[in-house]
Design a protein with these regions (language model features):
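Carbohydrate-active catalytic/glycan-binding domains of CAZyme proteins
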Residues: 1-180
Length: 180
């Protein structure tokens, strides 16, 4: 599902190879969700994990029931997890190691995607519990703004860092702004 929070809804598209475009299939749900992911939890229940506007980089993570057969989600959150800091926003798809689900989350305490937290996901009595088991931040000066995506699939890990495209110009503008 592409990021589409500003439109107020999430849509599913199908790639049209003949016309080389994405065709709208239907709206999954009408909520301003950010970096929403569809996950199959241990019991084969499906959920949408997400944060939402107006505080996408905050500390509240929501879980919505999802019907994979009809590709629709419920508008009312099943559960909300509140974190002590701004680490709620998804940073990619959840994944399993053995029977244990993990979720990559963005550390948004300094800025959007400052780093990645890997969180263990459990459900106890119908309530979701998350525990950070690892975190990492960029030590590469070329990607000093951080990491905002972590995906793992078929033995490959993809991490997306972000940076200023023209760091020298940004540094010069920063110096000039202090001269006022």
């Amino acid at each position: 599902m592409p990021e589409n929070s500003k439109s107020g809804g999430i849509n599913i598209y199908r790639y049209n190879a003949e016309k080389e475009r994405l065709d709208l299939v239907h709206e999954v749900g009408h909520l301003p969700l950010t970096d929403a992911t569809i996950v199959k939890f241990h019991s084969d229940e499906e959920f949408v994990f997400s944060t939402k506007l107006p505080n996408p980089n905050g500390n509240e993570w929501e879980i919505y029931p999802f019907d994979g057969k009809f590709m629709k989600m419920e508008a009312k959150a099943l559960d909300t997890v509140s974190f002590p800091s701004n680490i709620a926003r998804n940073a990619g798809d959840s994944f399993y190691i053995g029977e244990q689900m993990y979720r990559p989350a963005q550390d948004c305490n300094k800025c959007y995607g400052n780093g990645i937290n890997i969180q263990q996901v459990n459900s106890v009595g119908g309530k979701f519990e998350l525990k950070t088991v690892n975190e990492f931040h960029s030590d590469n000066p070329d990607y000093g703004l951080g990491y905002h995506t972590f995906n793992i699939k078929n033995g490959l890990i993809v991490v997306d860092g972000h940076r200023y495209r023209f760091p020298r110009i940004v540094k010069l503008l920063h110096i000039l702004s202090k001269l006022k």
